[in-house]
Amino acid sequence: MTVLVTGGMGYIGSHTCVELLEQGMDVVVVDNLVNSSAEAGRRVEQITGRPLKFYQMDVRDRAGLDRIFTEQKIDCVIHFAGLKAVGESGQMPLEYYDNNRGSTITLCEAMRDHGVRQIIFSSSATVYSGDNEMPLYETSRTGNCTNPYGWTKYVCEQILRDYVVADPSWSVVLLRYFNPIGAHPSGLIGEDPRGVPNNLMPYISQTAIGRLKCLSVFGDDYDTPDGTGVRDYIHVMDLARGHVAAIAYMAEHPGESIFNLGTGKGYSVLEMVHAFETANHVHVPYRIAPRRAGDLPTVYACPDKSARILGWHAEYSLEDMCRDSWHWQTQNPNGYETA
């Protein structure tokens, strides 16, 4: 089986490529390297001992996609490519809608014309409405998103759902991620954000190593046990395994399916800081900063459907997540730039 992975040089994409290659699948990656590095692909090959085929291009390049589908016998697609910073999306909404929505439409058009009918879409817990009770189920209310990034994921989900109605021979799996952290246990690949991190774990690890002076904790007056925001953190390798499980399911089940990929347990920002310090015997200085607009007090998944239908559940512990994040950071203090 050959899998086309858009955004395969990125954080989640590269770890998923490792899992796909180790399961014996062939992998073709398309990535424009706007927020990723080709070094990730070289290290994926180093980890697995297997090659991947890489096309550097934007997924919105229809002629480029036609070339890929002509040159490679693609069986299914995992669509990671897109802009992904929640805060930045509020400052650059047009770019986010153009990139995330546009790439999805162009990709589906190319798939349709080349007879490829199986796609896994990299969605997000941000599609859920902010007024849901916890935990979040696949049937919880969506829409009423709190930022443009979430809306782009919501719109892309709807595009794919509408297309399955128009052509029921398609298999579409929407995977709603919660908060991926951690890195491959080898320390060879991990999360390498450009500029100041948007996600908590690279912010913690870059502060611990001295690349950043202090961690900003956005708000300590939420209705949570310690006043800081609670999220469902999941090891990126668990997330990668979820995609392999979804490929197997998708091959036998046409139509649309939705699955949460989370642990079902939430941790606060301060709990994460203390867990990281304990796991790695380091100090993480932090300061309390004002709340960020759109941040919810508590978000965590109910992953029962994924366990029941996909046979998937998170296996890595919080200590594993913290340890692997730190291993990546210490092996690559400046990310892939040190290569």
Task: Describe the predicted segments one by one.
Residues G182-H184, D221-Y222:
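Short, basic/glycine-rich phosphate-binding loops at helix/coil junctions
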Residues Y97, T146-Y154, G190, R194-N198, ...:
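Short-chain dehydrogenase/reductase
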Residues M201-A339:
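C-terminal substrate-binding subdomain of Rossmann-fold SDR/epimerase-dehydratase oxidoreductases
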Residues M1-A183:
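N-terminal Rossmann-like NAD(P)+-binding domain of SDR-like oxidoreductases, especially those catalyzing
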Residues S186-L188:
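Catalytic core of nucleotidyl cyclases, primarily class III adenylyl/guanylyl cyclases
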Residues M57, F69, Y96, D192-V196, ...:
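Pocket-edge positions in alpha/beta enzyme catalytic cores
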